[in-house]
Amino acid sequence: MAFVLMNNTNAFLVTLLLLSLSYIPLSFSTIQQDFVMCLVDNSDASFPMDSSFFTHDLNASSFKLALETSAQNLRYLMPSNPKPEFIFEPLYETHVQAAVLCAKKLKLHLRLRSGGHDYEGLSYVSEMETAFVIVDLSKLRQISVDIESNSAWVHAGASIGEVYYRIQEKSKIHGFPAGLCTSLGIGGHIIGGAYGSMMRKFGLGADNVLDARIVDADGKILNRAAMGEDVFWAIRGGGGGSFGVILAWKIKLVPVPEIVTVFTVTRTLEQDGTKLLYKWQQVADKLDEDLFIRVIIQPTSKTPKSKERTISTSYQGQFLGDANRLLQVMQRSFPQLGLTKKDCLETSWIKSVMYIAGFPSTAPSEALLDGKSLFKNYFKAKSDYVEEPIPVEGLEGLWEKLLEEDSPLTIWNPYGGMMAKIPETETPFPHRSGTLFKIQWLTLWQDGKTSEAKHMGWMREMYSYMEQYVSKSPRSAYVNYRDLDLGMNGKGSDAREWGNRYFKGNFERLVEIKAKFDPENFFRHEQSIPTELE
């Protein structure tokens, strides 16, 4: 059960509030009581404190639901994983300010959650400090679209799908270049970079941010002018949970055509899949900027009734234009795929987003408002950036590795276009010119702890095999595909071990900004930006 905090500045009414909860008098801890009283004392009285507050002690089922609803990686919901003291869901910005002030006063460690998609569960689990609380921003999801200024203010708890839907409500010829997974929380998504199917045309979501509102470690709300250009730079790609609580982003809308074309073409190894993928590597970053073709690679049965497996390569594309122009582009640049008019689906931009995200073709656009993840598994993920085509022999070795595992999945996303034009120091996200494509590595399973060691072991072996074919010095990684194998704060490793992989030459600047903006390191987690380097 969630209990409701009613706004009262009067100490007597605060006492009545706590007494009203005392039907389980020994279960409501001193920490929780102190936090409730502090919240009421530090919130603006004009905004009712009717936020939800979930604690395991008062009602385990409601607490479990609040903890698990948005969590994507089931590995971090096992009974053995640390659980928060409580979960607080603010309804107004002033409640977030109060939560920061009270956590600081009571020396409580905060975990900040907007969408719950952190691959290593860092928005809802803490291994480094087990006495922690979650501030869940999912109720802060207001979206205000202004077509005249080509901009929108979007609060951190809104999902990417909601943002897309609210934009298309106002205009069929405007969009935003962000994520492919529509259940992502926009707060954490943009702060890590935010790539999507229009990145080759318009860059990342973080490249299209005009302003932001953030709560700092002193509980102050700062916009771009107040936080300064250094902090504004840092929060557009520097990773979540390091500089403050993102309340909202002001994003720049981009033009999209009335007709967008999507397609999926699948080839197996028996259909020259290896040769085709080698060719894709040579052209994917050089294609027309209106065209995005990613490759989804996984084992599949050779025939519907066969137990023998092969490798499937699915080329999934989005083109900002009609099918006739797409076919001209493909014939000129990538005829080897053999794309035909029959493969193409002409649709609206919003429907193309849903196609890429995996929604059924019959799903209405209102399905984007649901915000629920279509992907929920036990999994381990890693990432790589590729700067030279992987040779055929390297691909053949990869196929052998993939066929060893039960449910592996790898997704290759093309770069080039606008991504190659933006300097790598423009934001903390450095993976720009020279990158051909990014690889996401995944292994998924359904039976919890019993087979985790097996799947984790396979992932690390495969990752080791691929080292010779990917970026070097550093072997780069994407911060929003969080990977604790790269190193952790407080575990005896130099933060450069993971920081340089995520941010390359931008890491030291991030550390300098962190030291000035949050010198006490209030906002921290296993891979947060440190205040100093060893």
UniProtKB/Swiss-Prot annotation:
SUPFAM superfamilies with a match to the protein in the record: FAD-binding/transporter-associated domain-like
N-terminal signal peptide: 1-29
One MF annotation (Gene Ontology) recorded for this entry: coniferyl-alcohol dehydrogenase activity
Processing after translation: The FAD cofactor is bound via a bicovalent 6-S-cysteinyl, 8alpha-N1-histidyl FAD linkage.
Subcellular location per the Swiss-Prot or TrEMBL entry: Secreted, Cell wall
Alphabetized PROSITE patterns for the sequence: FAD_PCMH
Regions that span the bilayer: none
Top EC class for this record: oxidoreductase
Primary site of residence: secreted
Record text on cofactor binding: Binds 1 FAD per subunit in a bicovalent manner.
Domain of life: Eukaryota
Catalysed conversion reaction: (E)-4-coumaroyl alcohol + A = (E)-4-coumaraldehyde + AH2; (E)-coniferol + A = (E)-coniferaldehyde + AH2; (E)-sinapyl alcohol + A = (E)-sinapaldehyde + AH2
Cofactors, names only: FAD
UniProt keyword annotation of Secreted present: yes
Chain residue numbers at which the record places covalent cross-link 6-(S-cysteinyl)-8alpha-(pros-histidyl)-FAD (His-Cys): 117-181
Glycosylation sites: 7, 59
Keywords (A to Z) from UniProt: Cell wall, Disulfide bond, FAD, Flavoprotein, Glycoprotein, NADP, Nucleotide-binding, Oxidoreductase, Secreted, Signal
UniProt EC number: 1.1.99.-
Family: Belongs to the oxygen-dependent FAD-linked oxidoreductase family.
Function: Mediates oxidation of p-hydroxylated derivatives of cinnamyl alcohol (i.e. the monolignols p-coumaryl-, coniferyl-, and sinapyl alcohol) to their corresponding aldehydes. The electron acceptor required for these reactions is not known, but does not seem to be dioxygen. Is much less efficient towards cinnamyl alcohol.
Protein name as catalogued: Monolignol oxidoreductase AtBBE-like 13
